[in-house]
């Protein structure tokens, strides 16, 4: 009986809290509605566009291309470090649950290919995905904090990356070594489904598209600081450095590089975006309820 939907639970708690705090009953419903609107107002565009970008990066094979490239660069001996950086880079545009589902087949494929301990492969990547989801906008929690404290998204992202690096090193490869004595046996029912090599986007397109929001936020923030508030370009910079505008530019760019350019129809790409919105619907409601 106590397993209540999260959104409904937040509404009920808000209602009870309002009554116990002595808010006028006629104003209680309006107060709850205002909290919903104020919280979602600055976040819905960022979260929805971020989910769309992540879904396209995953379904187009760009995430697979990024992972394969980094693993080739790091080599078999340092594969844990390669997976750590893979998880971090992929985790910037992808939500944790999407990245987890996407990367699990890759981890099992590498475990089979290189005879690895599954924990040595999985822990570094999952730690990176988790840290990116918790520390870096445009993910829901950090984006909500940016909105609440009226912080600069680019500055928050920069500091988040700086703090994330030691966190993923400690929680990833270093922690994984302490688990080396544990050797789990993955179920054989996990089927590895990969995009064919000839259907993958190019390495440059994959990296550029996945990291474009990061590049734009850091570049516009640095340029704004360099030029100063009195610059005639300041109003334009403020517009294009707005997180919602950055994500809109990124999604338009991704529609071409990972969609139309690869021969996919506009209808197919828009279908991917529709599925992405379904994936984050409950997240948006929970965030709204918390407001």
Feature annotation, model-predicted:
Residues 1, 18-22, 92, 168-177:
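Membrane-embedded alpha-helical segments of multi-pass transporters/permeases
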Residues 1-8, 112-120:
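Membrane-helix interface "capping/anchor" motifs
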């Amino acid at each position: 009986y106590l397993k209540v939907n999260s959104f409904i639970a937040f509404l009920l708690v808000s209602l009870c809290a309002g009554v116990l705090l002595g808010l006028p009953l006629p104003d209680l419903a309006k107060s709850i509605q205002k909290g919903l609107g104020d919280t979602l107002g600055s976040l819905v565009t960022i979260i929805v566009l971020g989910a769309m970008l992540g879904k396209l990066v995953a379904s187009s094979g760009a995430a697979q291309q990024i992972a394969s490239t980094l693993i080739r660069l790091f080599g078999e001996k340092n594969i844990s470090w390669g997976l750590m950086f893979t998880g971090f880079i992929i985790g910037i545009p992808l939500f944790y649950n999407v990245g987890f589902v996407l990367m699990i087949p890759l981890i099992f494929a590498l475990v089979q290919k290189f005879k690895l301990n599954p924990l040595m492969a999985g822990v570094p990547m999952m730690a990176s995905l988790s840290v990116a989801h918790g520390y870096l906008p445009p993910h829901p929690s950090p984006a909500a904090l940016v909105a609440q404290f009226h912080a600069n998204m680019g500055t928050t992202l920069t500091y988040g990356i700086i703090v994330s690096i030691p966190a993923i090193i400690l929680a990833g490869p270093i922690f994984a070594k302490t688990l080396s004595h544990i050797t789990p046996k993955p179920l054989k029912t996990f089927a590895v489904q990969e995009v064919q090599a000839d259907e993958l986007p190019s390495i440059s397109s994959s990296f550029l598209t996945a990291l474009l929001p990061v590049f734009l936020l850091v570049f516009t923030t640095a340029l704004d600081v360099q030029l100063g508030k009195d610059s005639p370009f300041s109003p334009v910079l403020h517009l294009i450095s707005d997180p919602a505008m950055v994500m809109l530019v990124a999604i338009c760019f991704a529609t071409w590089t990972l969609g139309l350019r690869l021969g996919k129809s506009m209808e197919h790409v828009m279908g991917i975006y529709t599925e992405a919105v379904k994936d984050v619907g409950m997240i948006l409601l929970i965030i709204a309820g918390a407001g």
